[in-house]
Amino acid sequence: MELVKCQPGICNCSCKPESLIPTTTSTSTTTTSTTTSTTTSTTTTTTTTTTKDFNTET
């Protein structure tokens, strides 16, 4: 019965430590990917706005 209680979807079960390690790694990877995408979009927008301002003054 111990194998049935240790399901991949249940976190409050007395499973082996190996089952909890992959879960934590997946969460960290997802957060890093989201942060990288947001930073890239912000940098691109700032560069485009600055270029248009110079052309308008000229």
Curated annotation (Swiss-Prot):
Low complexity bias locations: 23-51
Region (Disordered): 23-58
Protein name per the record: Putative uncharacterized protein DDB_G0283705
